[in-house]
């Protein structure tokens, strides 16, 4: 019979720590707008929702590779959008996305 495992909260990174970690390790992020959204901003949830807005192509593939390394031990859920998609859906406003740069300064 499987039991419920307790979570060691001392090992969980804050949203600010996650933002700093991603900005420091994913150098290609300078080419994109990057945000966090979702329940982790409220201190609940079990993953970090990240929104990346920018061009597709080789730069995006490089960023995805950087995310694989940077997020190897993090529960990241990453959404990629072209700028026109973000504008048309008003995703940033509707989901109350917060820039990673702002979170990293907290």
PLM regions with names:
Residues 1-46, 53-106:
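Catalytic core of pol beta-like nucleotidyltransferases
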């Amino acid at each position: 019979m499987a039991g419920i495992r307790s979570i060691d909260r001392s090992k969980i990174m804050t949203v600010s720590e996650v933002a700093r970690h991603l900005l420091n390790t994913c150098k290609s992020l300078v080419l994109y707008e990057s945000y966090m959204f979702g329940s982790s901003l409220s201190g609940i949830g079990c993953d970090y929702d990240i929104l990346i807005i920018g061009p597709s192509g080789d730069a995006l593939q490089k960023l995805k590779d950087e995310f694989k390394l940077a997020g190897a031990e993090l529960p990241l859920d990453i959404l990629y959008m072209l700028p026109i998609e973000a504008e048309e859906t008003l995703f940033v406003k509707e989901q109350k996305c917060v820039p990673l740069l702002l979170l990293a300064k907290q």
